[in-house]
A protein has these predicted regions:
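Short beta-strand/loop motif that positions the catalytic acidic residue
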Residues: 90, 96-98, 102
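Hydrophobic, aromatic-rich cap/lid helix
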Residues: 32-35, 56-85, 89
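Short alpha-helix in the alpha/beta-hydrolase fold that links the catalytic acid
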Residues: 83, 92, 106-115
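A short, basic/aromatic alpha-helical/loop segment that forms part
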Residues: 7, 103-104, 131-135
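Catalytic active-site module of serine/aspartate enzymes centered on a nucleophile-bearing elbow/loop
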Residues: 119-153
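Short aromatic-enriched loop/helix-cap "lid" or pocket-rim segments at secondary-structure transitions
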Residues: 9-14, 51, 108-109, 135-137
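Acidic catalytic loop of the alpha/beta-hydrolase fold
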Residues: 77, 101-105
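Flexible "cap/lid" loop of the alpha/beta hydrolase fold
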Residues: 1-29
Length: 153
C-alpha cells in the first residue's frame, strides 16, 4: 500500500508544515506520536496507550533518520510518478482504499489514481482518516475481500 508518488497534500497539512519547525508526522517524543495519531486519524486506531508510548519512544529515537528520509523523498524527482506514464503501465487490478477525512493526503488523490491506473476501482471510507486499515479494520477488510472476490471471478 503506497501512494506511488501521487501526493496531493491537503491545504491543512501544507499549512501545518509551513507553520511548524519540523514535520508533524515525525514525532520527537512519545507525546508527539500521540498527537500525530490524533491528527492523522479520524477514528481511534485501536492501539492501547502503553503501545502508543512504546511506539512513540522508538519513533522519537529515529526522528533524525525519518527527517532525512522525508527530505530525500521530497527532493527526489523520481518519487513523483504522476503524469510520467509509469502508472498507466500497471495492468494489474488495483484497489484504491481511502479515508474521506484524510487530513494528510486529500481524497482528491483518488481521482488522480483512477485516471492514472486504468484497471482500478476505489472505495472511499466515510468518517475515516489517513490510516483506514487501523481506523476501520472491518470495513477495510470487507473492501479487500470484495475486491479480491471480484477479480478472482
Amino acid at each position: 500500500m503506497d501512494a506511488a508518488g501521487i501526493t496531493l497534500q491537503t491545504p491543512e497539512f501544507l499549512n501545518v508544515l509551513e507553520q511548524s519547525d519540523s514535520n508533524p508526522l515525525i514525532p520527537h517524543s512519545a507525546e508527539d506520536f500521540r498527537t500525530t495519531l490524533d491528527w492523522a486519524s479520524e477514528r481511534s486506531v485501536g492501539i492501547p496507550d502503553f503501545a502508543i508510548t512504546l511506539m512513540g519512544e522508538e519513533k522519537a529515537a529515529n526522528a533524525d533518520v525519518a527527517e532525512k528520509v522525508w527530505q530525500d523523498i521530497n527532493l527526489d524527482p523520481a518519487m513523483r510518478l504522476q503524469g510520467r506514464g509509469v502508472l498507466p503501465e500497471i495492468k494489474t487490478s488495483t484497489l484504491i482504499l481511502w479515508g474521506r477525512e484524510d487530513a494528510l493526503l486529500g481524497v482528491d488523490n483518488v481521482e488522480v489514481f483512477q485516471r492514472e491506473l486504468p484497471n482500478s476501482r476505489a472505495v472511499i471510507l466515510e468518517g475515516v482518516g489517513h490510516v483506514p486499515m487501523a481506523e476501520a479494520p472491518e470495513e477495510s477488510a470487507e473492501a479487500f475481500r470484495a475486491f479480491w472476490q471480484d477479480i478472482d471471478g
